[in-house]
Amino acid sequence: MTSEVSRRDFLKASAAGAGFVLTFRIAGGATSAAEAAGAWEPNTVFTIDPSGIITVHITKAEMGQGVGTALAQIVAEELEADWRDIRIDYPTSDPKYGLMLTGGSWSVNWTFDALSRAGAGARHLLIEAAAKHMNEPASECIAEGNRVRHLPSGKFLTYGDIVSKGLITATLSDEELKKIQLKKPAEYKVIGKWIQRLDVPEKTNGRAKFGIDRFLPGMVYAKVIYPPTRTGSKVVSVDDSEARKVKGYISTVREGDIVAVVAENYLAAVAAQGKMRVTWDKGPHANVTTDSITQDYWNKAKNDTSAPSWVDVGDADGALAKSMKTHEAAFWTDYVGHAPLEPMNCVARYQDGTFDFFSGSQFQTRAMGDLSKLFGVKPEQIRVH
Protein backbone atom coordinates (compact mmCIF):
# COMPACT_ATOMS: atom_id res chain seq x y z
CA MET A 1 0.00 0.00 0.00
CA THR A 2 1.32 3.43 -0.89
CA SER A 3 0.56 6.75 0.73
CA GLU A 4 1.67 8.78 -2.26
CA VAL A 5 -1.79 9.80 -3.43
CA SER A 6 -2.50 13.30 -4.73
CA ARG A 7 -5.76 15.20 -5.10
CA ARG A 8 -5.35 14.91 -8.86
CA ASP A 9 -5.22 11.13 -8.48
CA PHE A 10 -8.42 11.25 -6.42
CA LEU A 11 -10.24 13.19 -9.10
CA LYS A 12 -9.17 10.68 -11.72
CA ALA A 13 -10.68 7.82 -9.74
CA SER A 14 -14.00 6.57 -11.01
CA ALA A 15 -16.98 5.93 -8.79
CA ALA A 16 -16.50 2.20 -9.15
CA GLY A 17 -12.82 2.34 -8.40
CA ALA A 18 -13.32 4.54 -5.38
CA GLY A 19 -16.33 2.70 -4.01
CA PHE A 20 -16.99 -0.91 -3.20
CA VAL A 21 -16.57 -4.32 -4.75
CA LEU A 22 -20.03 -5.76 -4.22
CA THR A 23 -20.12 -9.51 -3.82
CA PHE A 24 -23.31 -11.10 -2.57
CA ARG A 25 -22.44 -14.08 -0.45
CA ILE A 26 -24.49 -17.23 -0.04
CA ALA A 27 -25.84 -17.60 3.48
CA GLY A 28 -24.25 -20.38 5.46
CA GLY A 29 -20.72 -20.14 6.80
CA ALA A 30 -20.51 -16.97 8.85
CA THR A 31 -17.73 -14.68 7.66
CA SER A 32 -18.13 -11.95 10.28
CA ALA A 33 -19.16 -11.38 13.87
CA ALA A 34 -22.51 -10.08 12.63
CA GLU A 35 -23.23 -13.24 10.65
CA ALA A 36 -22.07 -15.39 13.53
CA ALA A 37 -24.78 -13.68 15.61
CA GLY A 38 -27.44 -14.67 13.07
CA ALA A 39 -27.47 -11.46 11.03
CA TRP A 40 -27.30 -11.29 7.23
CA GLU A 41 -24.37 -9.34 5.84
CA PRO A 42 -24.65 -9.71 2.07
CA ASN A 43 -21.81 -7.30 1.31
CA THR A 44 -19.60 -4.65 2.88
CA VAL A 45 -22.38 -2.07 2.81
CA PHE A 46 -24.91 -3.15 5.42
CA THR A 47 -26.15 -5.82 7.82
CA ILE A 48 -29.69 -6.95 8.63
CA ASP A 49 -30.11 -8.60 12.02
CA PRO A 50 -32.85 -11.08 13.02
CA SER A 51 -34.96 -8.29 14.53
CA GLY A 52 -35.02 -6.47 11.19
CA ILE A 53 -32.66 -3.66 12.18
CA ILE A 54 -30.54 -2.57 9.21
CA THR A 55 -27.11 -1.18 10.00
CA VAL A 56 -25.41 0.68 7.16
CA HIS A 57 -21.63 0.74 7.44
CA ILE A 58 -20.46 4.29 6.75
CA THR A 59 -16.88 4.41 5.47
CA LYS A 60 -16.90 8.18 4.98
CA ALA A 61 -16.08 10.56 7.83
CA GLU A 62 -18.93 12.50 9.40
CA MET A 63 -17.71 16.09 9.60
CA GLY A 64 -21.04 17.82 10.05
CA GLN A 65 -22.15 17.41 6.45
CA GLY A 66 -24.62 14.61 7.22
CA VAL A 67 -22.88 12.03 5.06
CA GLY A 68 -23.90 9.12 7.29
CA THR A 69 -27.57 9.90 6.81
CA ALA A 70 -27.14 10.61 3.10
CA LEU A 71 -25.45 7.29 2.34
CA ALA A 72 -27.96 5.40 4.48
CA GLN A 73 -30.78 7.02 2.49
CA ILE A 74 -29.31 5.66 -0.74
CA VAL A 75 -29.27 2.11 0.65
CA ALA A 76 -32.71 2.42 2.24
CA GLU A 77 -34.24 3.67 -1.00
CA GLU A 78 -33.42 0.62 -3.09
CA LEU A 79 -33.73 -1.82 -0.20
CA GLU A 80 -37.29 -0.58 0.46
CA ALA A 81 -36.38 -0.26 4.11
CA ASP A 82 -38.42 1.35 6.86
CA TRP A 83 -36.36 4.38 7.87
CA ARG A 84 -37.23 3.75 11.51
CA ASP A 85 -35.22 0.53 11.33
CA ILE A 86 -32.10 2.11 9.84
CA ARG A 87 -28.95 2.52 11.92
CA ILE A 88 -25.41 3.53 10.98
CA ASP A 89 -21.96 2.68 12.25
CA TYR A 90 -18.41 3.61 11.30
CA PRO A 91 -16.24 0.52 10.77
CA THR A 92 -12.54 0.19 11.43
CA SER A 93 -10.28 0.66 8.41
CA ASP A 94 -10.11 -2.37 6.13
CA PRO A 95 -9.08 -2.77 2.47
CA LYS A 96 -12.40 -4.50 1.77
CA TYR A 97 -14.12 -1.10 2.01
CA GLY A 98 -12.10 0.35 -0.85
CA LEU A 99 -10.86 3.93 -0.66
CA MET A 100 -11.76 5.30 2.77
CA LEU A 101 -11.50 9.00 2.02
CA THR A 102 -13.81 11.92 2.69
CA GLY A 103 -13.35 15.24 0.91
CA GLY A 104 -14.21 17.31 -2.11
CA SER A 105 -17.95 16.58 -1.74
CA TRP A 106 -17.27 13.23 -3.41
CA SER A 107 -18.94 10.80 -0.98
CA VAL A 108 -22.39 10.60 -2.57
CA ASN A 109 -21.02 11.01 -6.10
CA TRP A 110 -18.54 8.15 -5.76
CA THR A 111 -20.76 5.68 -3.93
CA PHE A 112 -24.28 6.33 -5.23
CA ASP A 113 -24.37 3.56 -7.82
CA ALA A 114 -22.61 1.00 -5.63
CA LEU A 115 -24.84 1.69 -2.61
CA SER A 116 -27.96 1.68 -4.77
CA ARG A 117 -27.08 -1.70 -6.25
CA ALA A 118 -26.21 -3.07 -2.82
CA GLY A 119 -29.72 -2.22 -1.66
CA ALA A 120 -31.43 -3.32 -4.86
CA GLY A 121 -29.54 -6.61 -4.98
CA ALA A 122 -30.42 -7.42 -1.39
CA ARG A 123 -34.06 -6.53 -2.04
CA HIS A 124 -34.08 -8.95 -4.98
CA LEU A 125 -32.71 -11.79 -2.82
CA LEU A 126 -35.13 -11.02 0.02
CA ILE A 127 -38.09 -11.17 -2.36
CA GLU A 128 -36.90 -14.44 -3.89
CA ALA A 129 -36.38 -16.03 -0.47
CA ALA A 130 -39.73 -14.86 0.93
CA ALA A 131 -41.66 -15.93 -2.18
CA LYS A 132 -40.15 -19.39 -2.03
CA HIS A 133 -41.00 -19.73 1.67
CA MET A 134 -44.60 -18.58 1.09
CA ASN A 135 -44.80 -20.85 -1.97
CA GLU A 136 -45.82 -17.94 -4.15
CA PRO A 137 -44.39 -16.56 -7.43
CA ALA A 138 -41.75 -13.90 -6.86
CA SER A 139 -43.36 -11.89 -9.66
CA GLU A 140 -46.42 -11.43 -7.43
CA CYS A 141 -44.41 -10.15 -4.47
CA ILE A 142 -43.11 -6.70 -3.64
CA ALA A 143 -40.79 -5.28 -1.00
CA GLU A 144 -42.01 -2.38 1.11
CA GLY A 145 -41.25 -1.04 4.56
CA ASN A 146 -38.88 -3.82 5.65
CA ARG A 147 -41.12 -6.65 4.51
CA VAL A 148 -41.96 -8.71 1.46
CA ARG A 149 -45.68 -8.91 0.67
CA HIS A 150 -47.57 -11.22 -1.70
CA LEU A 151 -49.97 -8.88 -3.49
CA PRO A 152 -52.90 -11.25 -4.24
CA SER A 153 -53.13 -12.82 -0.78
CA GLY A 154 -51.66 -10.14 1.44
CA LYS A 155 -49.31 -12.63 3.07
CA PHE A 156 -45.98 -11.16 4.11
CA LEU A 157 -42.66 -11.82 5.80
CA THR A 158 -40.61 -9.12 7.48
CA TYR A 159 -36.94 -8.78 6.67
CA GLY A 160 -36.25 -9.90 10.23
CA ASP A 161 -38.32 -13.05 9.68
CA ILE A 162 -36.44 -13.87 6.49
CA VAL A 163 -33.06 -13.39 8.16
CA SER A 164 -33.91 -15.20 11.39
CA LYS A 165 -35.19 -18.23 9.45
CA GLY A 166 -32.05 -18.29 7.30
CA LEU A 167 -34.12 -18.33 4.12
CA ILE A 168 -31.64 -16.60 1.82
CA THR A 169 -29.66 -19.27 0.01
CA ALA A 170 -29.05 -17.54 -3.32
CA THR A 171 -26.42 -15.10 -4.47
CA LEU A 172 -25.94 -12.61 -7.28
CA SER A 173 -23.15 -12.48 -9.82
CA ASP A 174 -21.50 -9.21 -10.76
CA GLU A 175 -23.26 -9.28 -14.11
CA GLU A 176 -26.67 -9.85 -12.50
CA LEU A 177 -26.02 -6.99 -10.13
CA LYS A 178 -25.16 -4.64 -12.98
CA LYS A 179 -28.36 -5.54 -14.82
CA ILE A 180 -30.68 -4.66 -11.93
CA GLN A 181 -32.92 -1.74 -12.87
CA LEU A 182 -32.58 1.03 -10.32
CA LYS A 183 -35.36 3.43 -9.42
CA LYS A 184 -35.98 6.60 -11.35
CA PRO A 185 -35.84 9.85 -9.35
CA ALA A 186 -39.61 10.25 -9.63
CA GLU A 187 -39.98 6.99 -7.67
CA TYR A 188 -37.85 8.04 -4.71
CA LYS A 189 -39.47 7.82 -1.29
CA VAL A 190 -36.42 8.49 0.87
CA ILE A 191 -33.77 10.20 -1.27
CA GLY A 192 -34.32 13.93 -1.58
CA LYS A 193 -36.92 13.98 1.19
CA TRP A 194 -36.67 15.82 4.49
CA ILE A 195 -35.51 13.29 7.00
CA GLN A 196 -34.10 13.43 10.51
CA ARG A 197 -30.33 13.01 10.56
CA LEU A 198 -29.25 9.81 12.24
CA ASP A 199 -26.26 11.36 14.02
CA VAL A 200 -28.07 14.26 15.68
CA PRO A 201 -29.69 12.51 18.70
CA GLU A 202 -26.39 11.20 20.09
CA LYS A 203 -24.68 14.52 19.47
CA THR A 204 -27.34 16.34 21.46
CA ASN A 205 -27.60 13.89 24.37
CA GLY A 206 -23.84 13.53 24.80
CA ARG A 207 -23.55 9.87 23.79
CA ALA A 208 -21.63 10.52 20.56
CA LYS A 209 -18.02 9.43 20.79
CA PHE A 210 -15.26 11.46 19.19
CA GLY A 211 -11.57 10.67 18.95
CA ILE A 212 -10.82 12.66 22.08
CA ASP A 213 -13.31 10.56 24.07
CA ARG A 214 -11.21 7.39 23.74
CA PHE A 215 -9.60 6.19 26.95
CA LEU A 216 -7.51 3.03 27.27
CA PRO A 217 -6.20 1.35 30.43
CA GLY A 218 -2.81 2.69 31.46
CA MET A 219 -2.68 5.34 28.75
CA VAL A 220 -0.33 8.32 29.08
CA TYR A 221 -0.62 11.76 27.53
CA ALA A 222 1.66 13.62 25.14
CA LYS A 223 1.73 17.26 24.05
CA VAL A 224 3.71 18.40 21.03
CA ILE A 225 5.85 21.54 21.12
CA TYR A 226 4.91 23.08 17.79
CA PRO A 227 7.44 24.86 15.55
CA PRO A 228 7.07 28.59 14.84
CA THR A 229 6.46 28.02 11.11
CA ARG A 230 4.25 25.61 9.23
CA THR A 231 7.23 24.09 7.40
CA GLY A 232 10.98 24.46 7.39
CA SER A 233 11.73 24.96 11.09
CA LYS A 234 14.61 22.94 12.56
CA VAL A 235 15.28 22.16 16.22
CA VAL A 236 18.51 23.74 17.47
CA SER A 237 18.30 22.71 21.13
CA VAL A 238 15.89 21.33 23.72
CA ASP A 239 15.87 22.29 27.41
CA ASP A 240 13.42 20.22 29.46
CA SER A 241 14.93 20.89 32.90
CA GLU A 242 11.89 22.83 34.14
CA ALA A 243 9.42 20.43 32.55
CA ARG A 244 10.98 17.56 34.52
CA LYS A 245 9.92 19.27 37.77
CA VAL A 246 6.21 18.99 36.90
CA LYS A 247 4.40 16.35 38.94
CA GLY A 248 3.37 13.57 36.58
CA TYR A 249 6.11 14.25 34.01
CA ILE A 250 7.35 11.03 32.38
CA SER A 251 9.70 11.86 29.53
CA THR A 252 10.67 14.09 26.64
CA VAL A 253 10.52 12.58 23.16
CA ARG A 254 12.44 13.94 20.21
CA GLU A 255 12.24 12.43 16.74
CA GLY A 256 14.13 14.62 14.31
CA ASP A 257 12.47 18.03 14.47
CA ILE A 258 9.43 16.78 16.37
CA VAL A 259 9.50 17.38 20.12
CA ALA A 260 6.88 16.19 22.60
CA VAL A 261 6.53 15.79 26.33
CA VAL A 262 4.83 12.74 27.91
CA ALA A 263 3.02 12.79 31.25
CA GLU A 264 0.72 10.70 33.44
CA ASN A 265 -2.33 12.89 32.81
CA TYR A 266 -3.47 15.64 30.48
CA LEU A 267 -3.03 18.56 32.88
CA ALA A 268 0.51 17.47 33.68
CA ALA A 269 1.27 17.21 29.96
CA VAL A 270 -0.03 20.74 29.37
CA ALA A 271 1.98 22.10 32.30
CA ALA A 272 5.16 20.37 31.15
CA GLN A 273 4.64 21.56 27.59
CA GLY A 274 4.53 25.14 28.84
CA LYS A 275 7.87 24.74 30.57
CA MET A 276 9.72 23.24 27.62
CA ARG A 277 12.32 25.52 26.07
CA VAL A 278 12.97 24.68 22.43
CA THR A 279 15.24 26.84 20.30
CA TRP A 280 14.36 26.83 16.61
CA ASP A 281 15.99 27.77 13.35
CA LYS A 282 12.89 29.14 11.63
CA GLY A 283 14.26 28.44 8.19
CA PRO A 284 13.18 29.97 4.86
CA HIS A 285 9.60 30.69 5.95
CA ALA A 286 10.40 32.74 9.04
CA ASN A 287 8.75 35.88 7.66
CA VAL A 288 5.70 34.29 6.08
CA THR A 289 2.47 35.86 7.38
CA THR A 290 -1.16 35.96 6.38
CA ASP A 291 -0.51 39.36 4.78
CA SER A 292 2.47 38.09 2.78
CA ILE A 293 0.52 35.06 1.55
CA THR A 294 -2.39 37.31 0.55
CA GLN A 295 -0.12 39.70 -1.33
CA ASP A 296 1.62 36.83 -3.09
CA TYR A 297 -1.65 35.44 -4.40
CA TRP A 298 -2.88 38.90 -5.33
CA ASN A 299 0.21 39.45 -7.44
CA LYS A 300 -0.25 36.07 -9.10
CA ALA A 301 -3.90 36.81 -9.84
CA LYS A 302 -3.03 40.10 -11.52
CA ASN A 303 0.22 39.27 -13.27
CA ASP A 304 0.61 35.52 -13.76
CA THR A 305 -1.07 34.85 -17.11
CA SER A 306 -0.17 31.16 -16.90
CA ALA A 307 -2.35 30.66 -13.82
CA PRO A 308 -5.63 28.83 -14.53
CA SER A 309 -8.90 30.78 -14.38
CA TRP A 310 -11.79 29.57 -12.28
CA VAL A 311 -14.28 31.09 -14.71
CA ASP A 312 -13.55 31.75 -18.38
CA VAL A 313 -16.68 32.60 -20.37
CA GLY A 314 -16.85 34.80 -23.45
CA ASP A 315 -14.31 37.42 -24.53
CA ALA A 316 -13.71 39.50 -21.42
CA ASP A 317 -10.60 41.19 -22.81
CA GLY A 318 -12.43 42.19 -25.97
CA ALA A 319 -15.39 43.54 -24.04
CA LEU A 320 -13.13 45.60 -21.78
CA ALA A 321 -11.25 47.03 -24.76
CA LYS A 322 -14.51 48.28 -26.28
CA SER A 323 -15.91 49.71 -23.06
CA MET A 324 -16.02 53.48 -22.51
CA LYS A 325 -15.81 52.99 -18.77
CA THR A 326 -14.36 50.17 -16.71
CA HIS A 327 -14.55 49.39 -13.02
CA GLU A 328 -12.04 47.37 -11.05
CA ALA A 329 -12.83 45.79 -7.68
CA ALA A 330 -11.12 43.29 -5.41
CA PHE A 331 -13.06 40.89 -3.20
CA TRP A 332 -11.39 39.29 -0.20
CA THR A 333 -12.32 36.55 2.23
CA ASP A 334 -10.60 35.80 5.50
CA TYR A 335 -7.94 33.13 5.68
CA VAL A 336 -9.71 30.04 6.99
CA GLY A 337 -7.97 27.21 8.82
CA HIS A 338 -8.89 23.71 7.65
CA ALA A 339 -9.39 22.33 11.14
CA PRO A 340 -12.14 20.61 13.15
CA LEU A 341 -13.85 22.03 16.22
CA GLU A 342 -12.55 19.03 18.14
CA PRO A 343 -8.90 19.53 19.17
CA MET A 344 -6.57 17.44 17.02
CA ASN A 345 -5.85 14.20 18.84
CA CYS A 346 -4.90 10.57 18.43
CA VAL A 347 -4.80 7.60 20.79
CA ALA A 348 -2.35 4.87 19.82
CA ARG A 349 -1.95 1.32 21.12
CA TYR A 350 0.40 -1.52 20.22
CA GLN A 351 -0.83 -4.95 21.22
CA ASP A 352 -0.20 -8.46 19.91
CA GLY A 353 1.57 -7.26 16.79
CA THR A 354 -1.16 -4.79 15.80
CA PHE A 355 -1.17 -1.00 15.96
CA ASP A 356 -4.54 0.58 16.77
CA PHE A 357 -5.10 4.29 16.18
CA PHE A 358 -8.19 6.12 17.38
CA SER A 359 -8.58 9.51 15.72
CA GLY A 360 -10.98 11.71 13.81
CA SER A 361 -9.47 10.99 10.40
CA GLN A 362 -11.01 11.74 7.02
CA PHE A 363 -8.49 9.63 5.09
CA GLN A 364 -8.14 6.24 6.75
CA THR A 365 -6.61 4.59 3.68
CA ARG A 366 -3.72 7.05 3.54
CA ALA A 367 -3.29 6.85 7.30
CA MET A 368 -2.80 3.09 7.04
CA GLY A 369 -0.13 3.57 4.37
CA ASP A 370 1.69 6.38 6.16
CA LEU A 371 1.64 4.61 9.52
CA SER A 372 2.80 1.27 8.12
CA LYS A 373 5.74 3.08 6.50
CA LEU A 374 6.53 5.01 9.70
CA PHE A 375 6.58 1.89 11.88
CA GLY A 376 8.04 -0.42 9.26
CA VAL A 377 5.18 -2.91 9.38
CA LYS A 378 2.66 -4.33 6.93
CA PRO A 379 -0.52 -2.27 6.29
CA GLU A 380 -2.65 -5.11 7.67
CA GLN A 381 -0.97 -4.54 11.04
CA ILE A 382 -2.50 -1.05 11.14
CA ARG A 383 -6.09 -0.39 12.21
CA VAL A 384 -7.55 3.10 12.12
CA HIS A 385 -10.69 3.48 14.21
Protein language model annotation of sequence segments:
Residues M1-H385:
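Structural alpha/beta core scaffold segments of enzyme domains
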